[in-house]
Structures are given as structure tokens and as C-alpha cells.
């Protein structure tokens, strides 16, 4: 299968990209044809035929996180030619084999810091004026934003809807409480993914505990 890894590395986060790509080569869907789409505000040329660099304008935090899916939506034509697309935060460290269990329509990782908490305290967007709003009665699972993906058509549908919602919020002067993660959780609340356990996004702070 033809796989595209998407990551966004603005400012100092560019330092993490080489390690991420090395770990993907070593551990992630190793029997498949892996490519990368890198969004960055750093000046850089194409580094290999399997890595496409998409330049974005430098913006202050939290815009680079908030607008992840807006950036992705600008590369729809490129991404639609892949079988699967996965989005990683640039500073994710892959420490073990990730295999074909992630090759679903969409996958989402249950948030490691939230999975044992009561649903009533999950940090969904609670303001009704935001397009990321999730009502108390609809609270179910809470997902981490640092890794998600699936079949390209499903992923691109998600990117299109989330980017439109982020833009609508922006027009109304609203920033969702946890930025792209709030919008991701709204989308997964409506279109549930295949759940991956928190071990897929284990916090570095807990390593060794």
C-alpha cells in the first residue's frame, strides 16, 4: 500500500523531523511504500523523492496547531493518490512496531491522561458558539491529537470538515479550547474511529513508572 505520513514542524519543531522519519522507517508499516508530507515555515528544499515539503507562513502559537487540517486541506490533490494517510505530531517518538492494525477507515488514540477520568471532566469544547462544541450528554471517549489517520478518502473528509469549522470559528472570533484536539474530538464524536489504546501515545513523563 502507498502510505503518506503528514507532519507539521514550525520553528524549532523542525529539529524533531529527522528522528520521526527515521523511527517511521524502522517501526511504522514497514512493508509498505512510505512517503512524507512536511508542512514547515522553515526555509528548506525537498530532501528526498519520498518527502514533499509544503511551505506555510510563519504564525504565532496556537495557529500552527489550530490550523493543522487547514494546511492538510491545501494538499488534497497530492494526498488523494495515497491509500492511507497518517498525521503525526513532529515530536512523537515511535518505540515499537506499529503494524496493519492501524489500517482502518480512521483510527484514534484514546488520550492517556484522560482515559481513567470520568467523562464529565473530559476537556471537550463547552461553548455552544464554537463549531467544536460537544454537549454534556454527548460526551463519550476523548482522543489525543498527536496521532490519527486512516484511509485517504476518510482522512481527507475529516480534514475538509475540520478545516471548515476552524475557519468558521475564526470568522466568529473563536478559538477552540484545545485547538485542533477539540475539533478532532468533535469529529470523532460524530464519526467514531476505530479506537487504539493509550499505549499508542504513552506520555514520556510516565516512562519508567
Model regions and ranges:
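Short, polar loop motifs at secondary-structure junctions
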Residues: 36-45, 90-97, 199-201
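Active-site regions of enzymes building and remodeling cell-envelope glycoconjugates
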Residues: 47-59, 102-110, 209
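Conserved glycosyltransferase catalytic-site signature
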Residues: 65, 69, 90-92, 177-182
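GT-A fold catalytic core of metal-dependent nucleotide-sugar glycosyltransferases
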Residues: 71-118
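N-terminal anchoring/stem segment of glycosyltransferases
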Residues: 1-67, 74-81, 153
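Catalytic core and acceptor-binding pocket of nucleotide-sugar-dependent glycosyltransferases
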Residues: 137-209
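Short His-Asn-centered micro-motif
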Residues: 6-9, 38-41, 88-90, 110-111, ...
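PAPS-dependent sulfotransferase catalytic domain
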Residues: 101-157, 161, 181
